[in-house]
Amino acid sequence: SCSLVGSEMCIRDSVLTDIYVDKDKLPYERKRYIEAIEQYITRFGDDDVWIYSAPGRSEIGGNHTDHQHGEVLAASINHDAIAVAKKLDDQVVRIVSDGYNNLIAIHLDDLDKKDKEEGSTQALIRGVLAKTKENGHTIGGFQAYITSDVLIGAGLSSSAAFETLIGTILSYMYNQGNISAIEIAMIGQYAENVYFGKPCGLMDQMACSVGSLVHINFENSQKPEVERVEFDLDVHGYSLCITDTKGSHADLTPDYAAIPMEMKQAAACFGKEVLGEVSKKEILSNLSKIRAEAGDRAALRALHFICENERVQKEVDALKKDNFSEFLLLVKRSGDSSFKYLQNVFTCHDVSHQNVSVALAVSEILLEDKGVCRVHGGGFAGTIQAFVPNELVEHYKTGMEEVFGSGACDVLKIRKYGGIKVI
């Protein structure tokens, strides 16, 4: 544990480098940790505390495949939510979150879902506590100050990082660290679906909780297969750049909703619920039936799904063989398929705004053929992803920020840890 007096000492450079990978970020991370400890002391007094961390994530492969029980490849990144926390003897969890002055207090004898809390941080905390207890684990009181640099709305999964963080605290504080990363992810998903009221797949939570790269197969959606893939981007001399194209998510709900809906309509042509239950051969043999019954866009989206699903497995195979150039080619093909067939790069209801299309075009010009880019996450607005050689990062970042504004391009590393106790 660590107290303020020793906070400079207890946050060693080697620990920070191990977690955050990027040595240039060490002064920033050190300052952030010390400020978090100081904020904790302002709220709760000087104590011996523990520090926990849970990362954001980036989807690497499998664009819009999870809701059809397909496959996904996702990475945990070196942005995270951190908690400075202390165990309490009373049956209350008290949390202050950076940017919100209000203390959230959750009583452990009152963990039922509250409809009025839907969409709030309280709902996520209460949901994680309830499900952890329901699964037979010990829960107890603690107080924590939490700060996060996982950007909200930038497609890096801020809520999943938060849920993973609460689950990780409970695991280490009350269960000797024995709640598995996969179970913590499933607890987080439950909290988000049931208590927070947002239907979501399991990809975000899994990537935040497990760490490194995770390959997830959702064929059995109740018990997804999860495989951790070891991969060091730095060894290959590349960085992961996420650019916020500043496109608004407003009024895009119909566009997002149409994707799973049309894929399900294509699956319904075979009497199935989701496309994960239909083979490539079946889709190709019956394409005219899908076109007639569900329309051409549904047919194209079905073709994207079956090829994107295969691509995820090929990406995993390429990484296992350390064939990085093949991996990059597959990432590029994923992006091309999203643009051409999935069609989630701009909304056809407002063709004068195409932030993501512009970002992809500028990326390809800046990178020439040395790096690759793709839309990731939901699409239509928000962020794009690029794998950029380290020697081109400065050039790429400058070029993208000329178009999208200062700070729009975030240079990330893939971190090997999911939810962890740091100190």
Model-flagged regions — what are they?
Residues 51-57, 61-63, 210-213, 221-224, ...:
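Glycine-rich, charge-dense phosphate/pyrophosphate-binding loop(s)
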Residues 198-297:
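Acidic-enriched catalytic cores of C-N bond-cleaving enzymes acting on peptides and small amides
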Residues 1-6, 11:
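Single conserved hydrophobic/aromatic residue that forms the stacking wall/gate
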Residues 91-94, 251-255, 391-398:
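Short, conserved charged micro-motifs
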Residues 59, 66-72, 76-78, 118-124, ...:
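FAD-binding core of FAD-dependent oxidoreductases
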Residues 43, 137-143, 148, 171-172, ...:
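Structural signature of cysteine-dependent C-C bond-forming condensing enzymes
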Residues 14-51, 79-187, 356, 363-367:
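Anion-binding (especially nucleotide phosphate/pyrophosphate-binding) glycine-rich loop
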